[in-house]
Amino acid sequence: MQAPYLHKGNLSLGERRGPMNYYAAKELADSFRTVRKNTLLIAQDIPQEKYAFRAAPDTRSVGELLAHIASACTLQYQLHAVERRSSLEGFDLPSFIKRVLAEETQPRSKDQILEMLRGSGEKWAGFVEGLTDDFLAEQVQMPPGTTPPSKSRFEMILGVKEHEMHHRGQLMLIERLFGIVPHMTREMQSRLAAAAAKS
C-alpha cells in the first residue's frame, strides 16, 4: 500500500489510511528523540581534547560535526514551524545556509556543544510531536527545476533524522580511530555475551 503522505489522490487522509500500521507525529518525535539520545552518548564518549580532530583535510572537526548535527533541523524548523511554507520559491536558501554554517563554526566547549544538542533536539521533537496528520500530508513545492518537484512535509521532516544518522555513522567511525568502541556496539556485545552465558 502506498504511504499516505505520498498519495496524491482525492481521498481524505482518513479514507486513504486503510488497515496499515500508521506512523505519525508521535512516532516521528519519539524516533528522533532516540536518535538524538544516541548522538549525545557519542558526544559524551569522545574526550574534549579530541573535538578539534579532523579525519581528513577540508572536513568538519568532531566539534564542528556535532554542532552541524545540532543545527541541522534549523532549516526545516524555519520552513515548517516559522513560515509554514507551501513552496520554496522565493526562499533565499543560500543566504539561510550561509548564516547557519557561520553559527556552526563558532568556537564552543564540549559542554556547550552538548547543551546545544539537547536544546535543539528537544525544540525540534516538541514541534514535531504536535503536528497533525493533515499538516504532514501537505505537499511543499521545491524550487523550479528540482526533482521531484514537490515533497510531503512528512518526507522533509523525516529527513532531519536521516541526516543525523548519516553523520552519526561518521562519528562512530571516528570513535574507532580514537580506540573507542561505540556505545551501541558495546551494548550489543553485552547482550550477546549474556545470551551466550545462558546457553
List PLM regions with ranges.
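Membrane-proximal, proline-rich intrinsically disordered regions
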Residues: 46-48
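Short, helix-capping/interhelical loops that line the mouth of catalytic, cofactor-
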Residues: 15-27, 71-149, 178-199
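Alpha-helical transition-metal enzyme core signature, strongest for iron centers
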Residues: 32-39, 62-77, 107, 114-124, ...
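Conserved functional hotspot residues or short segments at active or partner-binding sites
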Residues: 58
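N-terminal amphipathic/basic-hydrophobic helices that include classical n-h-c signal peptides
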Residues: 1-19
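Surface-exposed patches in mature extracellular/periplasmic domains of secreted proteins
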Residues: 53-54
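Short alpha-helical transmembrane interface motifs in multi-pass membrane proteins
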Residues: 153-155
